[in-house]
Amino acid sequence: MAKRGGPRTVGVPWRFHLTPGIFMNSLVNVADNSGAKVVKVIGVVGHYSKNVHRRIPGVSVGDMVVVSVQEGKPEMRKQILRAIVVRQRRPFRRPDGTWVAFEDNAVVIVTEEGQVKGTEVHGPVAMEAAQRWPQVASIATMII
């Protein structure tokens, strides 16, 4: 029997499935110099959970999330922003069979169009995030 419905994510180009490592209400570090230090994940861009009751959306490297700034400069605190996940602690498997895990969970603050707000990224950036978001790759110092 053929599968009904469209692709898994509507409007987002297909990508290799990664193990989710960051969920709602997770506190994550900010890896750029935008002024925020710690943010809380409050939403996932492109996730619609009305079909599955009580499902908590999870994100992995390269996904865009909605965050609330918890720690940082006074003018940045309590703002609702968008961010891209560039590192996750949970191990995920790449198509070549290697497993990758980072020391912390980290995001990069971006605008709604995907333009990076900072001018540099501290620490490594996952290759999956760099391939999906070229603006992040252009300011990254290390891509793993």
From Swiss-Prot:
Keywords: Ribonucleoprotein, Ribosomal protein, RNA-binding, rRNA-binding. GO terms for biological process: translation. The keyword Cytoplasm does not apply. The keyword Glycoprotein does not apply. GO terms for cellular component: cytosolic large ribosomal subunit. One of its GO terms (molecular function) is large ribosomal subunit rRNA binding. Binds to 23S rRNA. Forms part of two intersubunit bridges in the 70S ribosome. Belongs to the universal ribosomal protein uL14 family. Part of the 50S ribosomal subunit. Forms a cluster with proteins L3 and L24e, part of which may contact the 16S rRNA in 2 intersubunit bridges. HAMAP family: Ribosomal_uL14 (MF_01367). This is Large ribosomal subunit protein uL14. It comes from Caldivirga maquilingensis (strain ATCC 700844 / DSM 13496 / JCM 10307 / IC-167). The lineage of its organism: Archaea, Thermoproteota, Thermoprotei, Thermoproteales, Thermoproteaceae.
